[in-house]
């Protein structure tokens, strides 16, 4: 692709109020370094856990680090799709997005090393087949499809898979689990800080995915059907993944409740329908300056904070 012009030099410059560039500025303002997190107390807390508790926590961490590695690799085609569409602001944000995902791989690996977990962890994924279906098949297939077909419909399918299922349902539910484990026991302060930092990054990622779906739905109502169909395909698979993980333990370590986790995941998935639907019939120009996607993620964060404060 030959370059014929530079968007950053166009008359009027860049629109810093557009949602993608707001997210970009927010990420710059909230930069954090994994090496600054203190994991020194986590090793002692880890040693005091039971074998089953360590097994479950290791499984949860294995699912996270493999997931973070997957999304680090799989986001690349979305950048190219934004370039093909001429959306420099989105492309700028996605460079930051990819960097943050790579940083999440780093910090989870640092935590595992700090608590002494250095064995091969692949077997933790073998008995949760839905995990492999989502992360090893559905995610790369949907994102790689953008290299051939960067159309709005393909972007919506990719965003639903990445931003709404992997991040918006599964990762949020995993963070909720980590918080319950750590806060109720008053343990693993390094993990608590790790999850807080990553969660802040992921809220921006999910907001971008919601924004992307909303602008395509506003531009062509047929894309609402694409969104709805893909969500309905993936939500049962995501819920099955949660069930498979809980079925491996009896009793469940940390007294975690499968019903609570299923309800949490379902709620996060279903409430995204309304936010996307609200873009139907809207003037496309309004969507670029509509911060509803950010507000939704902030609402989720506030609800979690209140729930955990009551523990």
From Swiss-Prot:
One of its GO terms (molecular function) is oxidoreductase activity. Homodimer. It is an enzyme of class 1 (oxidoreductase). Mn(2+) binds at residues 68, 101, 104. Belongs to the ribonucleoside diphosphate reductase small chain family. R2-like ligand binding oxidase subfamily. It comes from the Bacteria. Fe cation binds at residues 101, 167, 202, 205. It comes from Mycolicibacterium paratuberculosis (strain ATCC BAA-968 / K-10) (Mycobacterium paratuberculosis). Probable oxidase that might be involved in lipid metabolism. One of its GO terms (biological process) is deoxyribonucleotide biosynthetic process. This is R2-like ligand binding oxidase. Its cofactor is Fe cation; Mn(2+). Keywords: Iron, Manganese, Metal-binding, Oxidoreductase. InterPro entries: Ferritin-like_SF, R2LOX, RNR-like, RNR_small_fam. There is a cross-link at residues 71-162 (3-(O4'-tyrosyl)-valine (Val-Tyr)).
């Amino acid at each position: 692709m030959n370059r014929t012009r530079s968007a950053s030099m166009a008359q009027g410059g860049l629109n810093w109020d557009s949602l993608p560039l707001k997210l970009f500025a927010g990420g710059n303002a909230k930069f954090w370094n994994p090496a600054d997190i203190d994991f020194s107390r986590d090793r002692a807390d880890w040693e005091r856990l039971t074998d089953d508790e360590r097994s479950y926590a290791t499984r949860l961490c294995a699912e996270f680090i493999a997931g973070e590695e997957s999304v680090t690799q799989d986001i690349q085609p979305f950048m190219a799709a934004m370039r093909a569409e001429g959306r420099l602001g989105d492309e700028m944000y996605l460079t930051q997005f990819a960097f943050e995902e790579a940083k999440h791989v780093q910090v989870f690996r640092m935590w595992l090393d700090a608590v002494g977990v250095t064995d091969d962890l692949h077997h933790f994924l073998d008995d949760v087949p839905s995990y492999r279906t989502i992360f090893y098949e559905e995610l790369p297939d949907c994102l790689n499809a953008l290299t051939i077909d960067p159309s709005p419909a393909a972007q919506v399918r990719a965003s639903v898979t990445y931003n709404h299922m992997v991040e918006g349902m599964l990762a949020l539910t995993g963070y909720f689990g980590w918080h319950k484990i750590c806060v109720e026991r008053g343990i693993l302060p390094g993990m608590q800080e790790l999850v807080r930092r990553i969660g802040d990054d992921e809220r921006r990622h999910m907001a971008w995915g919601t924004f992307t779906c909303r602008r395509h739905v506003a531009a062509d109502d047929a894309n609402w059907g694409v969104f709805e169909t893909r969500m309905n395909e993936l939500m049962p698979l995501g819920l099955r993944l949660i069930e498979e993980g809980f079925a491996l333990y009896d009793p469940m370590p940390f007294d975690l409740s499968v019903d609570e986790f299923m309800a949490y995941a379902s709620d996060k998935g279903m409430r995204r329908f309304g936010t996307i639907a609200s873009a139907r019939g809207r003037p496309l120009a309004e969507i670029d300056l509509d911060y509803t996607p950010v507000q939704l993620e902030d609402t989720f964060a506030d609800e979690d904070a209140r729930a955990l404060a009551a523990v």
